[in-house]
Amino acid sequence: MGKVHGSLARAGKVKSQTPKVEKQEKPKKPQGRAYMRLLYTRRFVNVTLTNGKRKMNPSPASQ
């Protein structure tokens, strides 16, 4: 058994401090074949090439 890092009295401190955000109503994702088709179009059809590399997030937050 490993040693406990810090006292167990502080367990769950951060989770209890974070404000509760309600789940949003979203349109349902396609399933099975249709979802694989969506991934294919996202990855290979609408490719965003930057410096000759494929980027998953074309507009990153870093400058």
From Swiss-Prot:
Coiled coil regions, renumbered to chain: none
Disulfide topology: none
Gene Ontology CC, one term: cytosolic small ribosomal subunit
InterPro entries for the chain: Ribosomal_eS30
UniProt-annotated stretches for the region Disordered: 1-33
Gene Ontology annotations of biological process type: translation
Molecular function (Gene Ontology), one example: structural constituent of ribosome
Keywords in alphabetical order: Cytoplasm, Ribonucleoprotein, Ribosomal protein
Compartments, record wording: Cytoplasm
Subunit structure: Component of the small ribosomal subunit. Mature ribosomes consist of a small (40S) and a large (60S) subunit. The 40S subunit contains about 32 different proteins and 1 molecule of RNA (18S). The 60S subunit contains 45 different proteins and 3 molecules of RNA (25S, 5.8S and 5S).
Biological function: Component of the ribosome, a large ribonucleoprotein complex responsible for the synthesis of proteins in the cell. The small ribosomal subunit (SSU) binds messenger RNAs (mRNAs) and translates the encoded message by selecting cognate aminoacyl-transfer RNA (tRNA) molecules. The large subunit (LSU) contains the ribosomal catalytic site termed the peptidyl transferase center (PTC), which catalyzes the formation of peptide bonds, thereby polymerizing the amino acids delivered by tRNAs into a polypeptide chain.
Similarity-based family: Belongs to the eukaryotic ribosomal protein eS30 family.
Name of the protein in its database record: Small ribosomal subunit protein eS30
Organism: Candida albicans (strain SC5314 / ATCC MYA-2876) (Yeast)
Source species taxonomy: Eukaryota, Fungi, Dikarya, Ascomycota, Saccharomycotina
Protein's gene: RPS30
